[in-house]
């Protein structure tokens, strides 16, 4: 058994760690609320944009935009959104597992894949995973703007326009609630058709002044908005996961401190008992 001094040093060390994890929990809680506000403000735009684009994909247009054409999936691109930092539980691990499983299916079907990682953890993972990394972005911070992502996203869009990609997906952690964040893979290109209107009726629009000019701008903006929404959803998920992980670490530290204090008291009691025994033995010898 370690002596009382060593145990006391361990207790002090764990207490210092507990203070750090407790502070990180409070910081993550504050950042999560701000991230939730940003996510909630942009989510209606992204969802309604997806609905409108779904209706466009079902419409009968004289001008067929390349994003509306379904091609054989010979090469597939993934925009994978992760965190820049760790200490957020299994958030990134679960996301990467989902991507790897989907990539395996694509490769079994004979398709090649390339990646556009967003976030330091994603960049690090896919540089070692294997496969072409066409573009990447990291260090976006807790409040990224759309302009921070445009350059990276445009690289993948240009590859699609040139026929180098036949499918484009965005992968991120969707924020459900504080305790639940779900990794999702959403198809960006070709444009997914609206599921809710497939049975009831088809939508069509009148385009002024020119369908080509409008769609060229609208469809690019749609892809950018979906990627941006994925990023803000992932940030909210990151802060929620970090808050939960740091709370668990703080609670575990408290339990460890209690256990160490019990061991410390036993060691101290044993030392006192030994000293008393030595005193009694010495007195008896005299």
From Swiss-Prot:
One of its GO terms (cellular component) is plasma membrane. It is found in: Cell inner membrane. Belongs to the ATPase gamma chain family. It comes from Shewanella piezotolerans (strain WP3 / JCM 13877). This is ATP synthase gamma chain. PANTHER family: ATP SYNTHASE GAMMA CHAIN, ATP SYNTHASE SUBUNIT GAMMA, MITOCHONDRIAL. One of its GO terms (molecular function) is ATP binding. SUPFAM superfamilies: ATP synthase (F1-ATPase), gamma subunit. F-type ATPases have 2 components, CF(1) - the catalytic core - and CF(0) - the membrane proton channel. CF(1) has five subunits: alpha(3), beta(3), gamma(1), delta(1), epsilon(1). CF(0) has three main subunits: a, b and c. The gene is atpG.
